[in-house]
Design a protein with these regions (language model features):
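Intrinsically disordered, low-complexity segments enriched in polar/charged small residues
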Residues: 8-11, 166-167
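Bacterial N-terminal signal peptides that target proteins for export
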Residues: 1-9
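Bacterial N-terminal signal peptides
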Residues: 10-18
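Charged, low-complexity intrinsically disordered terminal segments
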Residues: 20-402
Length: 402
């Protein structure tokens, strides 16, 4: 069974599993999790709400550059080639092809030059990796491990994070994968549409920590202290200028309530004027649907960009469309991306707050997967996301209520 088939089976099994877990949760709680408190989308109010919700501290002094579609490989090559001390990579998908050859070339060259290279991949997403790619990395001196090895189909708690950290100073994250579908410019179904970010600054230590916890589980090893350079030692004041404040939220499996679900609801709740969502697997659960409905009825400009018929999992398209009538009736506007698979997982909240990462609105991300998303309060980053979201809508078809 190929990757797509195994992933579809995993999602179906997750829905059944989550149904049982939800029943268990409901016996202990009077109702499913629903974030009721209002919260602002910027400044100390949001930063404190984020800390309460997922234990992530917003830190200042970060700079973000968008790296969408095939441009992410240019950014990866550029940053990896600059590595002097360490390269740490955790990915759900790394598969043979042109994209793989580009990254292999840089990583193996750096490893042979003495850079400590650590690679961790998930076997469910990366099928041929262990046979075709792992030996070449190891021959060059890289440490390579498979996260929770096969039979992966018997363990749905997979690693869906997409994190690359170079020298502890620069990180790349988003919906990315090392696979040829990510190389192009989303012009046709062979070139996927995705959103990624390069970030530098103190928040990189939080992405490094997310890698470190997965590496420790797989190897029993800690990263050296040199992988956490001092990028800002002083305790920040929440009253400082807000541009460049960011935090990385790492989520792990739980039968009760994950940080992925908590974070998603917090971002939705924070919106006062607009909430623009790009979501590759849009199958929100009932509490999230209710929250989106509430925000739309309160006058928030709620827009959802999801895949259309080019979705790589047709069964998810059916589940996705089953949510439309309730959302449309409340005033949520929905578009389906037409040229190719739309794989982004982003949120734009009001005028300053953005999210980019690996979290999907589905039963797997909210319950079973290792996930991670970057949250950044930054006006320039928000303007960039606004621009490419509007550009994406030009290539999408708006769904109308029947």
């Amino acid at each position: 069974m190929g990757r797509g088939g195994r992933w579809a089976v995993a999602l179906a099994a997750a829905i059944v599993w989550v149904g049982g877990a939800s029943c268990s949760r409901n016996r202990e709680q009077s109702q499913p999790f629903y974030l009721r408190s209002e919260v602002g989308s910027q400044g100390p109010e949001f930063a404190k709400a984020l800390y309460q919700t997922v234990s992530t501290r917003m830190v200042p002094g970060n700079r973000l550059r968008w790296a969408n579609n095939g441009a992410v490989f240019d950014v990866m090559e550029e940053e990896l080639s600059r590595a002097r001390s360490s390269i740490n990579i955790v990915l759900f998908i790394w598969r043979p092809g042109q994209a793989s050859e580009r990254i292999l070339s840089v990583v193996t060259e750096r490893a042979r030059a003495g850079v400590a290279c650590r690679v961790l991949v998930d076997p469910l997403g990366s099928g041929p990796f262990e046979k075709d790619i792992k030996p070449r990395l190891e021959e060059a001196g890289c440490q390579v491990h498979i996260f929770r090895p096969l039979p992966a189909d018997e363990n749905l708690a997979r690693n869906h994070r997409k994190i690359i950290v170079v020298d502890g100073r620069v990180a790349i994250t988003g919906g990315l994968a090392i696979q040829d579908e990510w190389l192009g410019e989303a012009r046709n179904e062979k070139e996927w549409r995705d959103t990624n970010a390069r970030v530098e600054g103190p928040v990189v230590a939080q992405l490094q920590q997310a890698f470190a916890e997965n590496w420790q589980e797989s190897t029993g090893e800690l990263l050296p202290s040199s992988d956490f350079p001092a990028l800002g030692n002083s305790e920040p004041s929440l009253d400082e200028v807000r541009d460049g404040w960011g935090g990385f939220v790492a989520s792990t499996a739980s039968p009760e309530l994950t940080r992925a679900e908590r974070l998603t609801q917090l971002m939705v709740r924070a919106a006062r004027k607009r909430l623009w969502i790009a979501q590759s697997y849009f199958t929100p659960n009932e509490p999230l649907i209710a929250l989106l409905v509430e925000q739309a009825r309160a006058g928030v400009d709620v827009r959802v960009l999801a895949p259309g018929d080019k979705n790589d999992h047709k069964s998810i398209t059916l589940l996705q469309r089953a949510t439309y009538s309730t959302l449309l009736a409340a005033g949520v506007r929905i578009w389906e991306y037409q040229p190719s698979m739309m794989h982004a997982k982003t949120m734009l909240v009001d005028d300053r707050l953005v999210l980019v990462g690996s979290i999907n609105y589905d039963a797997l991300s909210f319950n079973l997967l290792e996930e991670g998303s970057l949250v950044l309060e930054d006006q320039e980053a928000a303007r960039g996301m606004e621009a490419f979201f509007l550009e994406d809508l030009k290539h999408a078809k708006e769904v109308k209520a029947r």
